[in-house]
Amino acid sequence: LFHGVGAVDSIVDVCSVAICLDDLGIEDIVVESLSEGHGTIHCAHGLTPIPVPAVVNLCQAGNIALTPAPVAGELVTPTGAAIVTALRTSEHLPARYRIEAVGYGAGKRPYEGCSGTLRCLLVHADA
């Protein structure tokens, strides 16, 4: 996971997620599925199909569902897949919940027909 050009970026991403989750006191992480694009991407090993092998292996190991998106390009990086695989505690939201906060993150790559953003909700289950 930590080889190649993005090694430092990946380490910073993983550490940043850990710090944020700790600061917010997050105990459960719900991820129903990850939306993934299609096509190929150039990487250190040449032209590689999307999802790239690391994402395939991580999602398979973590039983993470991938939902095809009508987008040409990589939406799920190996670092993102590793974070979800390591931290997800459930694939289902509570039957009833209240939204306490919303956070958005945006990538740098432009995609046609896709915002390239990630939305996270901080929720509390309703009794």
Residue ranges and their predicted role:
Residues 2-25:
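Conserved phosphate/anionic-ligand binding catalytic regions in large, soluble enzymes, centered on
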Residues 26-126:
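Mobile "lid/hinge" segments at catalytic clefts and subdomain interfaces of large enzymes
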